[in-house]
Amino acid sequence: MRITDKQVAVLRAQLVGNREEHLRLADQLDPDEANVCYTALVAAAFIEAAEERFIRNGDAVDHSEVIDFVAQVRERADEMPDIIDPQIAESMILDLLGKGSMVDADPDTKFGHQIVLLAALVGEKQFTEDQLDAFLGNARALADELLQ
């Protein structure tokens, strides 16, 4: 399986905050696409965004910067403390950086955390359309690698 333009369009719509378009496009994905390919695309985009945000000059940032980021994400909306568990969110990032290990969580919980953290990371960058396209292209290439 490979990542399709349709799957990239679903993620793009979500990351630019176009909820209606995101839901419309997501409804068009077949369940296998959504469960395998789209999940891999989100994971790859999360990896790309987190590494860009939390690795500087080849070194991972301190734990405190990850903790501060997660706290800021949880403060952005009233419902965020109910959506984002700080222990899970921090462990996802720290595991990716090689500074900790992922706490036990079911796949749906991990995916939900990934997508919210990804949206926050992309939102911080304030990408132009061209920059977002380049970011999604990199994520797509990584996702294709993950699926092999």
Positions of PLM-derived features:
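Short, mixed-charge aromatic SLiMs
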Residues: D62-M80, N138-Q148
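Amphipathic protein-protein interaction modules
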Residues: D68-G123
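Short N-terminal edge-element motif at the start of the domain
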Residues: M1-H22
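Long, hydrophobic, amphipathic alpha-helical segments used as structural scaffolds
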Residues: A50-V61, P81, D104, K125-E129, ...
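Glycine-rich, aromatic-bearing surface loops/beta-hairpins
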Residues: V122-Q148
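N-terminal interaction modules that seed assembly of large macromolecular complexes
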Residues: G17-G58
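Alpha-helix N-cap/helix-initiation sites
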Residues: N35-A40, P107-F111, E129
